[in-house]
């Protein structure tokens, strides 16, 4: 018996102890629906991998080092020093890297977070949303003084990127691996370095 996609077929099923017929519906297209869902899932996985590859390439073009991984500790506030009347405080967290399995100390400049309070003594609101277990994507400058870490995970205010001053970012990754917005892209205080 031949079927066509979407065609509903019936099969007689004999019940035990009687000659009653029951009809059971079989949909010829149900197997292909599962295959189509698997194809969509595989395409989504490939797209997220491609997106990460594109993000890594963009980070290299911005003269930065690219890291992704899980937050294992933080965020915590660290006071800074005054620069032209604005406190340059930091937020610190620890990231377990996907690339090499090592823990990195992440030093985040609060002044580049949207809504930064120049007189505040706390983690800025966008960075306060980061929780232990969250996945992050970072582009910045590696350092080894005082331990392994990364900083400059922020905009460089439109200057030409260099290895000393990359045009970096900090993004929270969604469960599907897609990156969110850069949490360190505020240009409000770029005037401090002009």
What are the language-model segments listed below?
Residues 1-35:
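N-terminal secretory signal peptides that target proteins for export/translocation
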Residues 35-43:
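Sec-dependent signal peptide recognition
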Residues 2, 29-32, 47, 121, ...:
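Intrinsically disordered, low-complexity segments enriched in Ser/Pro/Gly/Ala and basic residues
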Residues 52-194:
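OB-fold and OB-like single-stranded nucleic-acid-recognition modules
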Residues 42-51:
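Hydrophobic h-region of N-terminal signal peptides that target proteins for export
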């Amino acid at each position: 018996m031949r079927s066509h996609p979407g065609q509903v077929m019936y099969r007689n099923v004999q019940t035990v102890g009687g000659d009653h017929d029951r009809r059971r519906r079989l949909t010829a297209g149900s197997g292909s629906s599962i295959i189509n869902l698997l194809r969509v899932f595989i395409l989504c996985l490939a797209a997220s991998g491609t997106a990460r590859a594109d993000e890594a390439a963009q980070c290299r073009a911005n003269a930065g080092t690219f890291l992704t991984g899980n937050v294992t500790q933080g965020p915590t506030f660290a006071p800074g020093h005054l620069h032209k009347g604005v406190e340059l405080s930091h937020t610190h967290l620890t990231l377990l890297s996907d690339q090499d399995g090592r823990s990195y100390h992440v030093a985040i400049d609060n002044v580049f977070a949207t809504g930064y309070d120049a007189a505040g003594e706390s983690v800025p609101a966008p960075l306060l949303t980061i929780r232990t277990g969250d996945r992050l994507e970072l582009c910045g400058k590696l350092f080894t003084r005082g331990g392994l870490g990364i900083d400059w995970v922020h905009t460089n205010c439109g200057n030409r990127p260099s290895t000393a001053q990359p045009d970096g970012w900090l993004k929270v990754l969604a469960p599907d691996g897609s990156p969110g917005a850069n949490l360190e892209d505020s240009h409000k205080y770029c005037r401090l370095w002009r």
